[in-house]
């Protein structure tokens, strides 16, 4: 049995990449492996909840302080002080290397292309490293297209979500990119009873998730007797755009935002229609969660949704951007809701037989079971480890100057806003 260290991209469970690998960790522990996870510190109640969630499945978490956890040019905030951010990057590589030694780690796995510290630490310690890719190098993740050589160089094995993403990435790498299916636990608990039909969309409110398209379709549907409910946190700027449209069209009483919930499916009833209008997905894990609960689903035809749809053949597909077609699909499901609901519930047993961790993670599990054949990354950084991990200790005067510089940078940033 192996000691496996994961590097996680976020300290939350509001995205498919985290959910999928959480259940991979859970399954690996069931098989007898030891699993440890490293992510960035966010403090407070959210971190406490996160830690408790992982303790429930037997995973020890390390929470590392940082200015920015992802690559400097990745989405997720601007770095105001590059020197300080670089110091944290270097410090965290050192801490991860120490965790590898202390826990006798056999394998490091980086979840998403957005985190790179584990790849460097693994190379410094001469430990195999797997990289799991969930993102197309397009739109908000286009930044990593010029990092493909690094990703390949510092990976013993590469894996990506199956289907369109894997097809897209395969010609970009010299190494084989092994496929895997994003997995989530199969909920066997019955949905609570609802009083009336509602339209539900689960997931973070973002431009990529494209909820404004659903709001526009809802206005065109002109069924104010049916609520539109969004479950999930939000990006403030995109939420403001949605709010503006809702107010302009006097939909405030009919459109609800419930925010981030620990278990969003506890809010969903057996009278709900799930709609997922995302413009870009790598798989569509929330779609799978919905159909496994026997809910009628309408989803856009983005590449990730199509990958999942090809596996499960459940739900209704509409052409992304075609609001008129989305309205037609909504009208059809509302008009014949009982028929659509009955068919969805009868299909659950078939869907569950297609969706098991053994099948979803077959290639990753095979790589772990034959780790002795994978070797290390192409590049060995152990000879220059100290250059990459040791920070100079500043004098008191230098610390004071850095503090003044940070304050000035923050003031300039606020003045630009």
Describe the role of every protein-language-model region.
Residues 15-23, 197, 206-220, 240:
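A conserved mid-protein helix/loop that constitutes part of the nucleotide-sugar donor-binding site
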Residues 265, 284-287, 305-306:
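Short glycine/serine-rich donor-binding loops of glycosyltransferases
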Residues 260, 279:
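Aromatic "clamp/platform" in nucleotide-sugar-dependent glycosyltransferases that forms part
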Residues 189, 338-395:
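A charged, aromatic-enriched C-terminal amphipathic alpha-helix characteristic of glycosyltransferases
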Residues 296-300:
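Short hydrophobic beta-strand element within catalytic cores of glycosyltransferases
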Residues 312-324, 331-338:
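Conserved acidic donor-binding segment of nucleotide-sugar-dependent glycosyltransferases
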Residues 62, 138, 153-188:
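Donor nucleotide-sugar binding/catalytic pocket of nucleotide-sugar-dependent glycosyltransferases
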Residues 38-46, 202, 227-241:
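Glycosyltransferase donor-sugar binding loop
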């Amino acid at each position: 049995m192996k000691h496996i260290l994961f590097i996680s991209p976020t300290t939350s469970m509001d995205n498919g990449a985290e959910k999928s690998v959480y259940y991979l960790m859970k399954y690996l522990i069931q098989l007898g492996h030891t699993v440890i996870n490293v992510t960035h510190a966010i403090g407070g109640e959210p971190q406490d909840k996160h830690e408790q969630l992982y303790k429930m499945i037997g995973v020890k978490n390390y929470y590392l302080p940082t200015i920015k956890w992802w690559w400097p040019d990745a989405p997720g905030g601007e770095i105001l002080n590059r020197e300080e951010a670089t110091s944290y990057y270097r410090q965290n590589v050192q801490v991860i290397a120490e965790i590898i030694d202390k826990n006798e780690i056999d394998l490091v796995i980086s979840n998403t292309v957005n985190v790179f510290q584990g790849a460097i630490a693994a190379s410094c310690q001469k430990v195999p490293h797997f990289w799991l890719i969930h993102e197309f190098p397009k739109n908000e993740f286009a930044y990593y297209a010029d990092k493909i050589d690094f990703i390949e160089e510092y990976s013993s094995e590469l894996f990506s979500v199956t289907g369109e993403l894997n097809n897209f990435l395969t010609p970009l790498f010299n190494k084989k990119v092994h496929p895997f299916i994003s997995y989530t636990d199969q909920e066997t608990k019955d949905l609570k009873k609802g009083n009336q039909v509602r339209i539900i969309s689960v997931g973070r409110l973002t431009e990529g998730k494209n909820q404004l398209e659903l709001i526009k379709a809802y206005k065109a549907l002109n069924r104010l007797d049916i609520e539109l409910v969004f479950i999930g946190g939000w990006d403030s700027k995109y939420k403001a755009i949605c709010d503006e449209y809702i107010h302009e069209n006097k939909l405030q009483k009919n459109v609800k935002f419930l925010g981030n919930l620990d278990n969003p499916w506890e809010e969903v009833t057996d009278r709900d229609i799930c709609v997922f209008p995302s413009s870009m997905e790598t798989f569509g894990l929330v779609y799978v969660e919905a159909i496994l609960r026997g809910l009628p689903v309408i989803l856009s035809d983005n590449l990730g949704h199509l990958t999942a749809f090809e596996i499960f053949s459940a739900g209704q597909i509409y052409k992304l951007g075609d609001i008129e077609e989305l309205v037609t699909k909504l009208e059809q499901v509302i008009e014949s809701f009982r028929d659509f609901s009955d068919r969805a519930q009868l299909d659950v047993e078939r869907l569950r037989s297609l969706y098991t961790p053994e099948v979803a993670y077959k290639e990753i599990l095979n790589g772990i079971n034959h780790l002795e054949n994978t070797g290390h990354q192409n590049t060995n950084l152990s000879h220059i480890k100290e250059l990459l991990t040791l920070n100079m200790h500043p004098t008191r005067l230098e610390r004071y100057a850095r503090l003044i510089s940070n304050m000035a940078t923050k003031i300039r940033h606020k003045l630009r806003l």
